[in-house]
Structure formats: C-alpha cells, structure tokens
Amino acid sequence: MSLGTEEYTWFNILLESMGAKKGAEFMQALAKQDLQMPGSSSVMRVQLMLAGESAIAIAARGRRVTEYKQQGAPIDFRILDPYAGEPNFVALLQRAPHPHSALLFIDWILSEEGQTRLADAAGRIPVRKGIKQKPWVQELFQKDFVFLSPSSIGPNLNSLIEQYNQIFAVRKTK
C-alpha cells in the first residue's frame, strides 16, 4: 500500500469523522501496515501502483484514477466513507495590483464557460451544477463528498502536519 507524504486533507477529514482518539488509533494501525510513502504526488503513486510497486494507493485522486481507467489501464477504485473532496480555491488578495482584472477572472472562472473549460481542459470536477463532465468522471459521483472546512484545518495546520508526520514517520528535509 502507498500513501502520500502530505495527505493532510484526507487525514483531517478522517480524524474529524472518526473522532480524534479513534481516528488517531486507526492511523497508527494503518502506519504499521508496511506502507510505502514515495512522495506527495498522487499521480506518481498511481503510476507506481500501475507499474506493480504497490497494490493499493490510499487517498489517490479519483479523477486521475478514472482517467487511467478510461485509457485502458488495469485499475479500479473504491469510494470509502467518508468520501473526501478537496476543493480548489480562488481568492483575491487584499492589495492586488489589478483587483478589477482579478474580479473579472473570478467571475469568469465561476461562470458556466469557465467551469466548462476547467472540466474539459483540466479534467477538474466543476462546482457549478449543470456542467457537462467527461463521462469517465461520472463514476466519482456515486457518493456525496465531505469537504474539508478551511476553518477546521487552518488554525490547526501545524499540529495536524506534526501529528501526520509523527504517526507515519515522515521525515521532512529543510
């Protein structure tokens, strides 16, 4: 089994859904399962799995797995509970050098055209309802996502990273 070295969103959602104590116990038991932690890239872990380096890629990005599956790779996935969705954010800096241009971009990226472009060109899962998605992405909608609340991770990010690194023996280089 492989797990990324920076799966903090997945880690936080499981701790929240299972409760801190039970979640930590689960993670400690998982860490004892001879995990491979080749790096932070989900794509790389899925590619290593396809090359036979591991049988399971935990917390792999579903859109990448479905993309490889659609291309004929011998791969499949299971959606477990909770099904963690990792939103992409768009923000405007308080002192942006060109705030009006930034607002126009935000309006566009959230528009039907912008969300369609994200779905088509980047293979992203749009947040806007009614956007036609690539057929192979439809499998990811078998269950509802549980999204990470930025307010739950933001203030606790450093301690969450420390706990993750300690449980999974992740060594960070400075």
What positions do the PLM features span?
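Sec/Tat-exported extracytoplasmic proteins
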Residues: 18, 30-34, 53, 61, ...
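Short amphipathic alpha-helical coupling segments at ligand-binding clamshell hinges
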Residues: 22-26, 97-109, 117-120
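Solvent-exposed, polar/charged alpha-helical surfaces in well-ordered, non-transmembrane soluble domains
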Residues: 28, 47, 51, 66, ...
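A bilobed periplasmic-binding-protein/Venus flytrap-type ligand-binding module shared by bacterial periplasmic
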Residues: 15-16, 87-101, 117-118
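Extracellular/periplasmic bilobal clamshell ligand-binding domains
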Residues: 135-174
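Periplasmic-binding protein-like
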Residues: 1-6, 109-132
